[in-house]
UniProtKB/Swiss-Prot annotation:
Family label: Belongs to the radical SAM superfamily. Anaerobic sulfatase-maturating enzyme family.
Keywords: 4Fe-4S, Iron, Iron-sulfur, Metal-binding, S-adenosyl-L-methionine
Lineage: Archaea, Methanobacteriati, Methanobacteriota, Methanomada group, Methanococci
The Radical SAM core domain, residue ranges: 2-221
A GO molecular-function descriptor: oxidoreductase activity
Residues that coordinate or bind [4Fe-4S] cluster: 16, 20, 23
Co-factor requirement: [4Fe-4S] cluster
Ranges annotated as spanning the membrane: none
Protein's UniProt name: Uncharacterized protein MJ0907
Length: 286
């Protein structure tokens, strides 16, 4: 076991309504996580640490929002003595007033995935090819109307890099306080053609440093703080209960299944940067 596990990512569904051109997830099935699997993961983690963050992801996690509600209720009923924070990473296209009210009631922190304005329609279209950006922006406006703060996560590729400065200006005008830049992690060999120019990205970061917004990016983090994986503080469980050190490594290096705890083996991994990104680039360049 890894001591001090603090961050549990639950892939509550593999279903998604978008078709991102660089998708990290394997969307070959439409399976939802069941409550038993989620419960086993939570029980396992809370045996290691009573202060944890549970993040709901997918797919698009709002497609299985009933499970999210059930998980929070379970934790409130059974772990009221623990410090548990909740977060969701969503494309925001499904957010309506009912969901916004429930998110606020359950005190779930929100992260929204969007890669720009017009360019987002190319990078993150719907399954049928139609644009998704306006629906994401609509979800953002609904959250804002309910005074629900949210951060933005943007995957940086060579397609959207030229437009990111204007996008940041838009977010500032909208009232967004923080944005995370996540350099593309190539899940397939063809994704290597989308890799951004790191020198140009660093130039952009230097320019954005004068803007009134908190910019989080993996490039500038201390090496031992690059991600939860490097400190042994991350557990990712997919819809089947399979365990990985990082969502990006799903399907590549399974460490067991949460429903068979006797066979779980979690090594400690140290990396100079993003272990998953390094691993994938080396793999696909062979």
């Amino acid at each position: 076991m890894v001591d001090g596990m603090k961050h549990l990512i639950l892939k509550v569904t593999n279903r998604c309504n978008l078709n991102c051109i660089y998708c990290y997830a394997n969307n070959k099935n439409n399976k939802d996580m069941d409550f038993k699997t989620a419960k086993n993961a939570i029980d396992y983690l809370l045996n290691l640490d009573n202060q944890i963050k549970i993040q709901f992801t997918g797919g698009e996690p709002l497609l299985n929002f009933n499970l999210i509600e059930k998980i929070v209720d379970y934790c409130n009923d059974n772990y009221s003595n623990c410090n548990i924070q909740y977060a969701i990473q969503t494309n925001a296209t499904l957010i309506n007033e009912k969901i916004a009210e429930k998110i606020k009631e359950l005190d779930i922190k929100v992260g929204i995935s969007i890669d720009g304005l017009e360019i987002n329609d190319i990078l993150r279209p719907y399954k049928n090819g139609k644009p998704s950006t306006l629906d994401t922006l609509k979800g953002m406006y609904i959250l804002k109307s309910y005074n629900i703060p949210f951060g933005i996560t943007t995957v940086v590729t060579n397609k959207n890099l030229p437009y990111l400065e204007e996008f940041v200006k838009y977010l500032i005008a909208f009232g967004v306080k923080s944005i995370s830049f996540d350099l593309l992690k190539p899940k397939k060999k063809e994704h290597l053609t989308l890799m951004p120019n790191i020198e140009e990205f660093n130039k952009l970061l230097n320019k954005l440093g004068r803007y009134p917004i908190y910019i989080k990016n993996l490039q500038k983090r201390p090496k031992d703080k690059y991600c939860y994986l490097n400190s042994g503080d991350l557990l990712f469980v997919n819809e089947f209960g399979d365990i990985y050190l990082c969502p990006t490594l799903e399907g590549l290096s399974c460490l067991g299944n949460i429903n068979d705890k006797n066979k779980i083996k979690l090594p400690k991994v140290k990396s100079k940067g993003c272990y998953a990104r390094e691993f994938l680039i080396k793999t696909f360049k062979k």
